[in-house]
Amino acid sequence: MRITLAAHCSCRVGGVEQYLATLVPSLLAAGHDVSCWFETAAGEHEPILAADAPVEAIVASEHRDPFGAARAWRPDVIFAHGLSDAAHERALLDVAPGVIFAHDYHGTCISGTKTIRAPRARCCERTFGPSCLVQYYPRHCGGWSPVTMVQLYGLQRARLGLLASYERIAVASRHMAEEYARHGFASKVRVVGLPIESPVAPAARDDGDGAWRLLYLGRLEFAKGADLALESAVRTAALMMRPVHLQISGAGSLDATLRARADHLTRVEPRLSVTFTGWLDQRKAAAAVDHSDLLLVPSRWPEPFGMVGVEAALRGVPSVAFAVGGIREWLIDDVTGRLVDADPPCVDAYAAAIAACLIDRRWLARVRQHCRESATRFQISSHLAALEPVLAESAYARLARTVA
């Protein structure tokens, strides 16, 4: 097949771009022709495409006629990934039949988090529509700007409308399949999983100074629960009466608040130490996982998948996570980590789950082995076996309708 991958950025600025960096060489190796269509470039980041990759790349922001160039390449199918401009989506769907990979809540939530904050934080299962505008402020679904709210609503409404024009909707989890089924797309949605592989072999474990080592790896935002990771760590130190070190790796709007709070908590509880590293590249993130006893995934929002937990599991590190979204499809409670009830997401319950993991060394050893075994399900070969039929049936669906 001739496959055009369409995405927002040509550089590795997030999980979507990292996925594409893994997918492109695999599609080429499988005998497909691949081109890429990007809305923009971010030159300070590592590019998705290797310098010697036999792939035509079109960057819309730098091209006089990006859609004409896409059409001239004559793709069999467009495989879209989170374009920021709905007009770009619409134009590309005129070029060839389309498959969209819904990496997030594309077209089904104003804020994109599917999380309400009032009267208490919990995941939202509403079907997107005008009533979301009524609920937005009372439920604290997002920010306080009415202009931004209306703009985001318009964007998501346009995206939802465009989903009907795609031949198929690919998702990483059954949770996301259910989300799009609720919005009327049950016949189009296909679960294809994600390819997750380790960049380097796991390093030998080093118990170091005897402190328990916890790792939070992600955006420092309310929806991701970065604050819950910090508050749970100090409670764990108090519960265990033993040194606990928490490494927080990431960036976001809570950065300054978390640093100030950590400074206070480490003075109150001297058995707690906290290190902030900012974002880590793939290899440094892998090294951080190797030096951790547990990965903390305290997300309040229903993670579409939560690939960070599988990345850690491949390296033999279990996760403690709230039972939300797609997390429940890779984290098996008491087998590859601990699931904590998320209604509501409670610091005390989360800290108790962390302590329960750490107090039993035999349990930890058993779970580490199960993590490695379970995570091997998410190989690129398995992903391609699920994805290729979806792309093929989409490529020929429009042709079949035309002939009929």
Positions of the model-derived regions?
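A short, well-ordered alpha-helix in the C-terminal region of glycosyltransferases
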Residues: W363-R377
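Nucleotide-activated donor-binding/catalytic signature segment of Leloir-type glycosyltransferases, i.e.
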Residues: R259-R283
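A conserved mid-protein helix/loop that constitutes part of the nucleotide-sugar donor-binding site
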Residues: Q18, T22, W212, R219-R235, ...
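Membrane-proximal helix-turn-helix segments that form the acceptor-binding/catalytic region
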Residues: H106, R122-R168
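N-terminal strand-loop element at the rim of the active site
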Residues: A6-V13, Q18-P66, G252-S253
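Carbohydrate-associated surface elements
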Residues: H175, P195
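Acidic donor-binding loop of glycosyltransferase active sites
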Residues: D290-P304, V317
